Design a protein with these regions (language model features):
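Low-complexity, Ser/Thr/Pro/Gly-enriched N-terminal "stalk/linker" regions
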Residues: 1-60, 82-83, 87, 96
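Solvent-exposed loop and edge beta-strand segments that line ligand/cofactor-binding
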Residues: 2-16, 47-66, 73, 103-120, ...
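Well-ordered alpha-helical scaffold segments within catalytic/enzyme domains
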Residues: 6, 10-26, 66-78, 120-136, ...
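Active-site acid/base region of carbohydrate-active enzymes
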Residues: 16-36, 75, 93, 126-180, ...
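Extended, well-ordered alpha-helical scaffold segments
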Residues: 29-36, 76-91, 133-151, 194-217, ...
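Catalytic cores of carbohydrate-active enzymes
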Residues: 57, 95-101, 156-167, 174-275, ...
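Aromatic-rich carbohydrate-recognition surfaces in CAZymes
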Residues: 58-156, 182, 294-304, 320, ...
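C-terminal hydrophobic structural anchor segments
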Residues: 293-333
């Protein structure tokens, strides 16, 4: 991989996490799950862009924003979504870099490391928001795509190079070409074609075929190229992003989640086999089990969407449990311990008021019409 400038998290962000862990209490919202979620989404708009949460992440995170851009658009916030993209592109172009995070003052950083999915997330959200790129923005993205290919892609095959140590959605775990990353690159390839971006020359179909031929194990998409374990984002994102459109495989995955009780007590745990993964040092020490079998509401909201999209018999029960969790904590929390209590560790506690609440608010649109 070519050497790129490192954009480390500023010390102020680390202090913010420490302060939030020991000295700040969660804000609480009144009302039912829908009212709480709607209030959170409203407050995550800071007048300039959508921040990621009302707690630890009061800044811009492209990965999270990309996953809620469609939901925010469905909720009627299309102008704010596009304003967020404009602002983010301005900050990126000013520094000639694309990072996972941007502070409200426009400072770029990656947390915990540079992300394999950073550029795919940016390009995906541009496409899903129907954002009109100007020539300056297009030229910038063409350069970043060239760098991405140099850093991550085997030019002969178009596939991800093996064993990158860079981060991705489940950033406490270390992957070797995760199914999630392959799905995000498939979406980037699709979006590039439709946005008229020429510097990523590979067809989205080769990544779809890779998922089907190498990652699908009969029950779900394997976590990565060599690890056959279940990981929520790797199992769900290929269907959520429509990298794979196969209802039989989707229902096989939903069967597995049901049978293995992965969505209990709330949707849903990262994995049912946490010992089958390698974790970064901080995820084994000061933030133990952060990316193990903890419950992540991000994937939980996606899970509900997929359940209702297939009109599954367990959909209503899971939605009721999820709503009770939101009402129990009077917020949309980031993650919970396996027993359903709020996650706390030596350095870190679960954030509050996650922008992911936007996904939850659009679940009704996936329910069968009566």
């Amino acid at each position: 991989m070519n050497r790129r400038k490192v954009y480390s998290a500023p010390t102020s962000q680390l202090w913010h996490l420490f302060y939030y862990r020991y000295f700040r209490k969660h804000a609480k919202f009144e009302g039912d799950a829908e009212a709480i979620s709607r209030a959170i989404v409203e407050k995550c708009w800071n007048g300039t862009f959508y921040c990621t949460s009302l707690g630890n992440f009061d800044y811009f995170w492209i990965r999270d924003f990309a996953t809620v851009a469609k939901s925010l658009r469905q909720l009627g916030y299309v102008d704010k979504v596009r304003a967020t993209i404009t602002w983010a592109l301005e900050q990126y172009m000013r520094r000639d870099a694309v990072t996972l995070c941007i502070t409200p003052l426009g400072n770029l950083f990656d947390a915990p490391k540079r992300g394999i999915d950073t550029l795919p997330s940016l390009i995906h959200c541009i496409w899903t928001a129907k954002y009109k790129l100007n020539e300056h923005e297009k030229n910038f993205l063409e350069r970043k795509l060239q760098e991405y290919v140099e850093d991550y892609i085997n030019p002969a095959t178009g596939m991800l190079l093996p064993k990158s140590d860079d981060a991705e959605l489940r950033d406490g775990a270390i992957y070797d070409r995760s199914a999630y990353s392959v799905a995000m690159i498939e979406r980037m390839a699709w979006a590039c074609k439709h946005l008229g971006l020429k510097s990523f020359p590979y067809s989205h179909m080769i990544y779809r075929q890779e998922l089907l031929l190498h990652y699908w194990n009969g029950d779900y998409f394997n976590a990565d190229f060599n690890n056959t374990a279940f990981s929520a984002e790797c199992a769900l994102i290929p269907f959520i992003m429509r990298s794979v459109e196969d209802t039989e495989k989707l229902n096989k995955t939903l069967d597995y989640i049901r049978d293995q009780h992965i969505a209990r007590p709330y949707a849903m745990r990262y994995t049912n086999t946490p010992k089958r993964f390698h974790y970064r040092l901080w995820a084994r020490t000061v933030m133990r089990n952060y990316a193990g079998d903890t419950i992540w509401t991000w994937h939980g909201a996606y899970y509900l969407r997929l359940l209702w999209g297939q009109n599954r018999p367990e959909a209503a029960e899971n939605e009721m449990a999820f709503a009770s969790m939101i009402e129990r904590y009077h917020t949309f929390p980031e993650l919970l311990n396996p027993d359903g209590t709020l996650y706390n560790s030596l350095l870190y506690k679960s954030s509050e008021g996650m922008i992911w609440a936007a996904i939850y608010l659009t679940i009704d649109s996936y329910k069968p019409k009566s």
